[in-house]
Amino acid sequence: MPTLLRLKKRRFQCKNCRRITVAKTSIVEKNCQISNLVRQKVSQLLTEKMSLTDIARRLRVSTSTVYRKLDQFSFKEHFDKLPRVMSWDEFGFKKGELAFVETKLITILDNHRQTTIRNYFLKYPLKIRQKIRFITMDMSGSYMLLVRRFFLNVQIIIDCFHIIQHLGRAFLKTRIAIMNQFDKKSLPYRALKNHWRLFQKDRCKLSLNSFYSKTFRQTLAPHEVIAKTLVFSKELTDYYTLYQLLLFHFQEKRVGEFFDLIEENRSKVNHYFQTVFRIFLRHKQYIQNALETDYSNAKLEATNKLNKDIKRLDFGFRNFINFKKRVFITLNMHKKRTYPVLYRC
């Protein structure tokens, strides 16, 4: 419930100069009607996934008050140090942004043009940039050119998620192409369409629990569904075997076997897999770094999810600076648990 305090301030008059002073209080600032505790609560709620309008409605203050509190925050950028490991990724905000993160978010640039990225990192001395050892990113070729130019001692690491994603998409398109060869009312078509998720999964991670399949009208385990479906197409069986072998070698970090299998089947597969294999061979050294190290873009992907949540909750910030402040407040401020204290005046 909102509480209204009627505060009467005592006045003191100097007997010598006759000047009058008013007693000060820690409850509110001078010439303000909103208490300091409410302002502190605004700062606390800015770290949560709440829109600025919801914060204002919850604390019974205006939205402008919340915006003014947000404007009071400032984050000074230090160009005298960089982490040993960095992650690069982009997310959508109007024209697109690029984020850099280690254990804490370093910065968010207002676009992902090479000029913007170059001008930002040129603010760091060469000696500082040479201390970076690893940078994880997706397969965007434009970033790799910048990394090799401005970070001389860096090893580029392709995020493992994007490697698996490329393989999964190639097999998904292959399965759809084979599925469309059958009549839409036939059993092979319905089996490939209804149980597509089982084919995308790693075979080693399939559940052992049985379920009732409406397609086959019987209770089957996931691996039994796959076995019954693969009987309909020799081509699909070959591609599924290749897909699962690539996943196995990648999960077991077998670099040699992974690329040997790609080289062996490069000219035998369809254009979906040929495109993926061509990309993998072009970035062979970076994928090898991913298999030989434990670094990934997991933290940054989680950060991007938070950025999108903030953007959605606030119906999109028109001001990029305010959006950047909100992200930094949410990520970099330490949240301490507070307890209500009851006292008598």
Predicted feature residues:
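Short, positively charged, Gly/Tyr-enriched micro-motifs
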Residues: M1-E97, Q130-I132, S142, R149, ...
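Conserved, well-folded catalytic cores of nucleic-acid-processing
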Residues: I20, F73-K76, F150, A170, ...
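Active-site beta-loop-alpha junctions of metal-dependent nucleic acid enzymes
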Residues: N31, K104-I128, F134
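Conserved residues at beta->alpha junctions
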Residues: L46, N111, D138
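A generic secondary-structure signal for well-formed alpha-helical elements
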Residues: M50, Y143, V154, F171-T174, ...
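Acidic/histidine-rich catalytic cores and adjacent linkers
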Residues: L70, K95-F100, K127-Q155, F161-Q165, ...
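Conserved beta-strand scaffold positions in the cores of enzyme catalytic domains, especially
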Residues: V85, I156-I157
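Short alpha-helix plus adjacent loop in nuclease-associated cores
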Residues: I163-K184
